[in-house]
């Protein structure tokens, strides 16, 4: 699984060298931010059901046509699948926060997602809207500390950019 630490070590090993001072500084910064990442992961895990519901509701409010016949949310089963997908992405963001890297999203969430959604006629813009809603709804310090919010938002931005 990719993280700052595994990336630095892999690059150093591939070059047949020890990690450089800048490599170690990068790792140090990552470790210093770990408390904020873990706070964000804890807050997300503790509120994930509400986060997913609000994100999904916002998506269907913005893209009401998705509930029309022939669309991605034409019946309750398909609507539930959309909420399930949002939940899946939030779990992967949580895992990214825990490991301190984008490995979980890269390996389990992004690789091939656009192609799958295109094949199934599911608009990625709807998922992007739900994730952006979560990012934009975040309120510091109500939801988490400022640094935890920065860490959480960074992974949401990464996911938004990957699906866009």
From Swiss-Prot:
The keyword Thylakoid applies. This is B-phycoerythrin alpha chain. (2R,3E)-phycoerythrobilin 1 binds at residue 82. (2R,3E)-phycoerythrobilin 2 binds at residue 139. GO terms for biological process: photosynthesis. It comes from Porphyridium purpureum (Red alga). It is found in: Plastid, Chloroplast thylakoid membrane. Heteromer of 6 alpha, 6 beta and one gamma chain. It is a peripheral membrane protein. The keyword Thylakoid applies. Keywords: Antenna complex, Bile pigment, Chloroplast, Chromophore, Electron transport, Membrane, Photosynthesis, Phycobilisome, Plastid, Thylakoid, Transport. Its main location: plastid. Transmembrane segments: none annotated. Belongs to the phycobiliprotein family. PANTHER family: C-PHYCOCYANIN ALPHA SUBUNIT, PHYCOBILISOME 32.1 KDA LINKER POLYPEPTIDE, PHYCOCYANIN-ASSOCIATED, ROD 2-RELATED. The lineage of its organism: Eukaryota, Rhodophyta, Bangiophyceae, Porphyridiales, Porphyridiaceae. Coiled coil: none annotated. Contains two covalently linked bilin chromophores. Light-harvesting photosynthetic bile pigment-protein from the phycobiliprotein complex. One of its GO terms (cellular component) is phycobilisome. Pfam families: Phycobilisome.
